[in-house]
């Protein structure tokens, strides 16, 4: 009997069962009651001090943080005078993600509902110039000036009223809960998914919510022996800083006795390199529409990084992962570098041979443009099922590969349409000044290329487009466990005070936005966000448990999710 294969089958079965038991609507089935009970909102006496330490700005609290946004909108909903502004806010967001065919009708309805003085929901706080532009305008971004005006209005008096409300106190309760330590015991490990230079990646489940994650475990001794502290901290800080549906998110960072752990978005569909070569070995590569869809999502992920002064430096098919629905995210930011304030370029050899731009190979200073060269290589490989500088399966020394990148003109097989060939050529320009890429703070120059003529960028970025391929939910897109291999024990490494301090700094706990999203999507937020119908202070704020409350209190509560 092949016990290695048996181990893989058993591990895969357990993991697939866990995947099947969880979705956003039926989370309770996969929750651990013991740990769920520990997710309990504290009395106000425990969290009032947070007023002094939290950033209480309108944008950060009410627009960026999911629970903050929900509570602010719930507050507005309970105050009739703020109803028109709230509804206009939501309707503009709905318009921005609507199908093109529906937008004219929605625009007309929006103008009639909020911009006409006789309308029931007339927004009298809007100035005449903003209203006139919204009435006369057309096309993308039509109502963005209007949305900015609405949010500017809500960020003044309504926001100050929110800060004096029970809804803000509820926000403090959630921030207290968010800050509580959640370490190794909160997570159940399933099978190993892969192995890197410093440790392994496991599929895991957050016990209290049932949500599945990937846990990257960096062995402490191996990190110290191979001088990996700086790289690990850079990756962790960058992951914590970025939040995009096109980049894996960091939800938790903690330490165990042996490892530093990064709990991140799990991508069950495997990497696109696997799909290029292994799914249909007789016909490797993607049809162009599929390659274009993935490229568009990668462009949005790169733009998010570059707007935050982060150069990725390791874009390649292995680092682009598919989720359950078939959308892709950029992963593995271990080689990324963040430019300092005022810095426009950096130096340093980093990346994968065949994907590194000429200026990087020559040891010159470089900027975000190196990532768009790598994007060109990645798109080429998606379509051609080979790299632009070597044939499939060809063994090429790095020195020879470097010369090809610097000097060789790229040839294109017949699989490339004129648009995809032109786009690749624009990305694979040897001269970074001529290369298509990030300009003036955005990737609009790429978005307007004919390659993306069928892509609705608004809907893509809202996650509303249907992917061209959906991974099989019954398949684990990972190597067999015995093929992943195992690390040998690291000997002769002792930790000192400086090591312990580094580990403690690394283990920063929960990341606010992903954690709040988890609470909402798994139903925990709705379960705990209980209010009295008479508008008085809920029992949990007073520190009164459900058992201590009056017998009739259960029927006298309402839940707002």
UniProtKB/Swiss-Prot annotation:
Pfam family, one: RGS
Subcellular locations according to the entry: Membrane; Cell projection, Cilium, Photoreceptor outer segment
Documented activity regulation: Inhibited by RCVRN, which prevents the interaction between GRK1 and RHO. Inhibition is calcium-dependent.
Topology of this chain in the membrane: Lipid-anchor
Expression sites by tissue: Rod outer segments of retina photoreceptor cells (at protein level). Retina.
Domain Protein kinase: 187-452
Record flagged with keyword Phosphoprotein: yes
Region (N-terminal): 1-186
Uppermost EC category: transferase
List of residues that carry Phosphothreonine: 8, 489
Catalyzed reaction equations: L-threonyl-[rhodopsin] + ATP = O-phospho-L-threonyl-[rhodopsin] + ADP + H(+); L-seryl-[rhodopsin] + ATP = O-phospho-L-seryl-[rhodopsin] + ADP + H(+)
Domain AGC-kinase C-terminal: 453-518
Lipid-bearing positions (S-farnesyl cysteine): 558
Subunit and interaction comment: Interacts (via N-terminus) with RCVRN (via C-terminus); the interaction is Ca(2+)-dependent. Interacts (when prenylated) with PDE6D; this promotes release from membranes. May form a complex composed of RHO, GRK1 and RCVRN in a Ca(2+)-dependent manner; RCVRN prevents the interaction between GRK1 and RHO.
Similarity comment: Belongs to the protein kinase superfamily. AGC Ser/Thr protein kinase family. GPRK subfamily.
Function: Retina-specific kinase involved in the signal turnoff via phosphorylation of rhodopsin (RHO), the G protein- coupled receptor that initiates the phototransduction cascade. This rapid desensitization is essential for scotopic vision and permits rapid adaptation to changes in illumination. May play a role in the maintenance of the outer nuclear layer in the retina.
Name used for this protein in its record: Rhodopsin kinase GRK1
Organism: Bos taurus
């Amino acid at each position: 009997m092949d016990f290695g294969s048996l181990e893989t089958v058993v591990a895969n079965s357990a993991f697939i069962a866990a995947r099947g038991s969880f979705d956003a609507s039926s989370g309770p089935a996969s929750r651990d009651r013991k740990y769920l009970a520990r997710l309990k909102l504290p009395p106000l006496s425990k969290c009032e001090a947070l007023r002094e330490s939290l950033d209480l700005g309108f944008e950060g609290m009410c627009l960026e943080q999911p629970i903050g946004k929900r509570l602010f909108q719930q507050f507005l909903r309970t105050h009739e005078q703020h109803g028109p502004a709230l509804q206009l806010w939501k309707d503009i967001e709905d318009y921005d993600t609507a199908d093109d065919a529906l937008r004219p009708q929605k625009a007309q309805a929006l103008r009639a509902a909020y911009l006409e003085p006789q309308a029931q929901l007339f927004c009298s706080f809007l100035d005449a110039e903003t209203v006139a532009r919204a009435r006369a305008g057309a096309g993308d971004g039509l109502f963005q000036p209007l949305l900015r005006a609405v949010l500017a209005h809500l960020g003044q008096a309504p926001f100050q009223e929110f800060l004096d409300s029970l809804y803000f106190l509820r926000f403090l309760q959630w921030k207290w809960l968010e800050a509580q330590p959640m370490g190794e015991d909160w997570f159940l490990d399933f099978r190993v998914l892969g192995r890197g230079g410093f440790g392994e990646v496991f599929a895991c489940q957050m016990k209290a919510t049932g949500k599945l994650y990937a846990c990257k475990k960096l062995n402490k001794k191996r990190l110290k022996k191979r001088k990996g502290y700086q790289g690990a901290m850079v990756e962790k800080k960058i992951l914590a800083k970025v939040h995009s549906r096109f980049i894996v998110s960091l939800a938790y960072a903690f330490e165990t006795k042996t490892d530093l752990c990064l709990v991140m978005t799990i991508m069950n569909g495997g990497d696109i390199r696997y799909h290029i070569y292994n799914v249909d070995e007789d016909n490797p590569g993607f049809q162009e529409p599929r390659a274009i869809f993935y490229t568009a999502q990668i462009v949005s992920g790169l733009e998010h990084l570059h707007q935050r002064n982060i150069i990725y430096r390791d874009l390649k098919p292995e680092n682009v992962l598919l989720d359950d629905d078939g959308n892709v995210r950029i992963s593995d930011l271990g080689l990324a570098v963040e430019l300092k304030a005022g810095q426009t370029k950096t130096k340093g050899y980093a990346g994968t041979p065949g994907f590194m731009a000429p200026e990087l190979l020559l040891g010159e200073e470089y900027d975000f443009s190196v990532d768009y060269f790598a994007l060109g290589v990645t798109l080429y490989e998606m379509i051609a099922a080979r790299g632009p500088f070597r044939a499939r399966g060809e063994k090429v020394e790095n020195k020879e590969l470097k010369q090809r990148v610097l000097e060789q003109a790229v040839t294109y097989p017949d699989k490339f349409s004129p648009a995809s060939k032109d786009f690749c050529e624009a990305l694979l320009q040897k001269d970074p000044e001529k290369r298509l890429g990030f300009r003036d703070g955005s990737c609009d120059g790429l978005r307007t290329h004919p390659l993306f003529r069928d892509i609705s960028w608004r809907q893509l970025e809202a996650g509303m487009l249907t992917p061209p391929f959906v991974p099989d939910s019954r398949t684990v897109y990972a190597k067999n466990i015995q093929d992943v291999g195992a690390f040998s024990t690291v000997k002769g490494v002792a930790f000192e005070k400086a090591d312990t301090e580094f580990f403690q700094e690394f283990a920063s706990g929960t990341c606010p936005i992903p954690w709040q999203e988890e609470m909402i999507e798994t139903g925990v937020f709705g379960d705990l966000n209980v209010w009295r119908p008479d508008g008085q202070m809920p029992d949990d704020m007073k520190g009164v448990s459900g058992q201590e409350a009056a017998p009739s209190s259960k029927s006298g509560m309402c839940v707002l999710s």
